[in-house]
């Protein structure tokens, strides 16, 4: 309030004349004086030293009256004058209480409100400081014994926030940010997620509801900060500030003026990553393309919630699974780390699909059946709690569905409720690209059985639970929610059931992958 009082004081008509001081007898034109005040930081810009000194004297007198101390050692002066036809830096002589205000050395800069100013108006000090701070903090985060998701959280919440003011006030080019800070960030992110150099980060830059990690690179944060700065100029109530926006709406600023706000920036960047995954990165974008076309979007946020609670090794497994950079023999051969790309059991190319859901030898050994039955066992154990119902499941320790359906067609699970409603649940756990194919195949397979059972029950409902090996729910699973609701499972319990299904799928697929090219030991069904 004290500083505001002083500002109002020097804005009065008497002292406004200082801003246009004129020696009419010798014909010196009007010279503008500008006073900038922000909290306890002040800056005075004038055309002549004596004008500046006059305003400083007034400020000094006012501070003495207010019993406030001016720390001269914390002040600085910076001077530019015209010599012949060129402008040059010089050392001005301005005093406060007869003490010479420290002068900015020739070729050096001073800092005001976070922005460095020098004679050349370069951003070298900003770049140097940003680089030092960024490297230092990223290195400290890297050394912390934290889960990768927590390291990414520190990077996103702390580091990007810390450098956002520098991004806002400086004129650093976006190119420098991309080539320098983005490179450092991606290097550490790859390290934390155990991603090879060849892996794309387009997946992890997506939002969590699209199976990404919601990571923002420094260049994106920079565009957001510049957008905020430009928007403040454009919509300022001050006409002069609006004019400043109009004058500077050229060259590099055009790329920031196209955005309405920071959300608009994120939307554009993520759209670009999605297009890259769908149209250019065929191998690493196959997962994204499949789930965008065939998954149940309302269930996708649950997947990210489960992923965030996984231990480091399985968490990183899901990331590398999504962008297809797990060490399969096909990838190892591509990277020059393996002499063969073939599976040691069946001699087919060992791709991710082959290891996770495609190898015929693995299928015959029961690896994929073990994963399927682990999910089914959880479902059956959970649904036995439904009151006044009878459950049949095609796994040991439960009544077999063949009691009702016979041996020709045997669904994974049958549930008969007290109101004579028969739920026929068929579970499929396959590769993401086969979500729709598996669902259609099972629907056709059991269509006759459904018609047959309608003669014996008041209602027959088919629940086509088509899941991916990483726990993604296919679109055919939408009626699974309806089934849980009909069985009087509240929203919280339904969410728990779906999360556990995702959890089991991810963990069993991780185990199947780790046992590739190894003897299968027929483990017990996974319990969580």
Residue ranges and their predicted role:
Residues 95-172, 228-242:
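Basic, alpha-helical interaction scaffolds
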Residues 33-65, 81-85, 121, 362, ...:
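Catalytic palm subdomain of template-directed nucleic-acid polymerases
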Residues 167, 176, 180-182, 188, ...:
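Extended C-terminal regions of large enzymes
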Residues 333-337, 382-426:
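Active-site metal-binding core of divalent-cation-utilizing nuclease and nuclease-like domains
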Residues 1-18, 159:
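Conserved pre-motif C helix in the palm subdomain of viral-like polymerases
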Residues 334-382:
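Short Cys/His-based metal-binding microdomains
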Residues 69-108:
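Short, conserved micro-motifs composed of acidic
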């Amino acid at each position: 309030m004290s500083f505001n009082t002083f500002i109002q004081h020097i804005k009065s008509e008497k002292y406004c004349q200082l801003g246009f001081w004129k020696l009419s007898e010798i014909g010196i034109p009007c010279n503008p004086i500008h006073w900038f005040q922000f909290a306890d930081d002040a800056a005075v810009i004038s055309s002549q030293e004596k004008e500046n000194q006059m305003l400083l004297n007034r400020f000094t007198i006012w501070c003495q009256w207010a019993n406030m101390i001016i720390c001269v050692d914390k002040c600085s002066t910076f001077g530019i004058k015209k010599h012949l036809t060129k402008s040059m830096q010089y050392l001005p002589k301005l005093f406060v209480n007869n003490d010479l205000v420290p002068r900015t050395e020739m070729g050096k800069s001073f800092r005001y409100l976070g922005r460095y100013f020098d004679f050349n108006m370069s951003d070298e000090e900003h770049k140097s400081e940003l680089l030092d701070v960024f490297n230092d903090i990223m290195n400290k985060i890297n050394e912390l014994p934290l889960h990768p998701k927590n390291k990414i959280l520190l990077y996103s919440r702390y580091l990007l926030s810390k450098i956002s003011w520098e991004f806002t006030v400086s004129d650093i080019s976006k190119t420098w940010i991309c080539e320098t800070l983005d490179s450092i960030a991606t290097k550490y992110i790859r390290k934390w997620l155990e991603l090879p150099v060849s892996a794309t980060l387009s997946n992890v830059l997506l939002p969590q509801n699209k199976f990404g990690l919601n990571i923002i690179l420094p260049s994106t944060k920079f565009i957001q900060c510049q957008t905020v700065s430009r928007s403040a100029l454009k919509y300022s109530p001050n006409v002069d500030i609006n004019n400043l926006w109009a004058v500077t709406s050229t060259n590099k600023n055009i790329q920031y003026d196209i955005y309405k706000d920071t959300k608009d920036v994120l939307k554009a960047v993520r759209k670009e990553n999605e297009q890259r995954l769908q149209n250019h990165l065929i191998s690493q974008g196959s997962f994204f393309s499949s789930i965008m076309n065939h998954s149940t979007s309302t269930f996708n946020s649950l997947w990210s919630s489960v992923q965030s609670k996984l231990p480091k090794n399985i968490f990183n497994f899901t990331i590398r699974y999504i962008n297809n950079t797990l060490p399969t023999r096909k990838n190892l051969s591509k990277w020059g780390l393996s002499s063969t790309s073939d599976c040691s059991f069946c001699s087919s190319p060992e791709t991710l699909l082959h290891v996770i859901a495609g190898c015929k030898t693995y299928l015959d050994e029961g690896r994929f059946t073990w994963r399927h039955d682990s999910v089914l066992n959880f479902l059956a154990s959970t649904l036995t709690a439904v009151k006044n119902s009878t459950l049949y499941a095609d796994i040991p320790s439960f009544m077999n569905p063949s009691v009702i359906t016979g041996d020709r067609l045997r669904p994974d699970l049958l549930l008969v409720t007290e109101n004579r409603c028969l739920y026929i649940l068929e579970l499929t756990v396959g590769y993401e690209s086969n979500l729709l194919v598996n669902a259609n195949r099972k629907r056709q397979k059991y269509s006759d059985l459904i018609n047959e059972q309608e003669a014996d029950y008041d209602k027959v409902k088919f629940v086509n639970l088509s899941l991916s090996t990483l726990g993604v729910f296919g679109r055919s699973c939408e009626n699974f929610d309806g089934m849980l609701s009909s069985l009087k499972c509240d929203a919280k319990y339904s969410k728990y059931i779906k999360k556990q299904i995702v959890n089991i799928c991810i963990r069993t697929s991780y185990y199947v992958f780790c046992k590739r090219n190894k003897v299968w030991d027929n483990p017990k069904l996974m319990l969580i």
